[in-house]
Amino acid sequence: MIRAGVGQSVDASTARAAGEAVQMALAQAGVSKADAVLVFFAAEHAARERELVESVRRVAGTDCVIGCSATGIMTASGEVEGGHGLAAMVLGAEQLHCRPLFFQPLREREFDIGVQLAGMVPPSEATGSLLALFPDTYNGQPQRLLESLHDERGFTPVVGAGASENGTAQATYQLSGAGVTNNAVAGLYLDGAFQAHIEITQGCQPISDPMVITKCERNLIYEINERPALEVFSSLLKGPLAADLRRALMVLFVGLPADRLINSVSAGKYLVRNIIGIDPDKGILGVAEEVSEGESLIFVMRDGQRAREDLTQMLQRQVNNLGGRKPAFGFYFNCCARGSSLYGIPGIDSAYIKQALGDFPLIGMFGGYELAPLGRANHLFAYTGVLTLVTGEDA
């Protein structure tokens, strides 16, 4: 039987917050000590890293501690955006093996770390395996790490999020049993007799038909459908957005194929990427991804109502995946641009999850980006929620 529990605290005292959250998690799991602890915390707690690490280790009774900073945290009790939120999940079970992972430095070592990961988490003979990663959002390129891991080992499902902060620290933090630092990637590898059900929900709605990039260089798009890229983009702007290009760039994005070979931007097959710059004189769009000529493209808009609808559909897929079973535990990695900034009110994602799936140990965070598989490859997502549900063989 998999034993899991979650707790959260908003206490400004780092030692009290960590102790309170872990104690709540142990109580829910029905254990006196944990095999592993996952912790998400507001960046304000990083200033007292010794208190944070020592409190978690002492109360949980383990050195297997992994986590990162976050702009917000989530449990089944609800969401905390900003403030001094701290959430902890404890795990323990004979059928679930937990291995903490930590690599530093991260910047310019993504390829090497991917190779090391492949050697540390070899293919398992168990029924389930799951790799959760929490890289420093401000350092490194996670897509390179994912590609390196895939090249070395083949497909291994990866979930996670970029460590985040509220903008005041100017740094994100990664946690291990040895301390708190940055320019690193923390992770947790799980294998054993379990199944992991992973689904994603996106917060953007297509506002154009699929198009084709006809001229480009690296991440600069010169032409779409043989017309200047900026001209095509501007033709889609309606109402107030047509008069305010700066505002338009905050809510409109491009969708690019997740699988370049299939080259499809149909529903569920594209990745949302920011438009990071424009050149009005040359009609160029700059996007946060390298592109190629002949690649499909779609324009999408960030939309709260569409996000609710897609969240509902994703949760129904998870209900179908479970087939009447109850999750032993779950992870939810939510984009920091979702939450109250997307819906207008806080707590939507956690409320929808609880309504659809009931009460179970759930921990989540608001990250700088999200990591999840789509098809048989792992990708970096934006404006997305990634829900991972774990069921044991005895579920």
Task: Locate each region found by the language model.
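Small-residue-enriched flexible segments
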Residues: 1-36, 41-50, 55-57, 63-64, ...
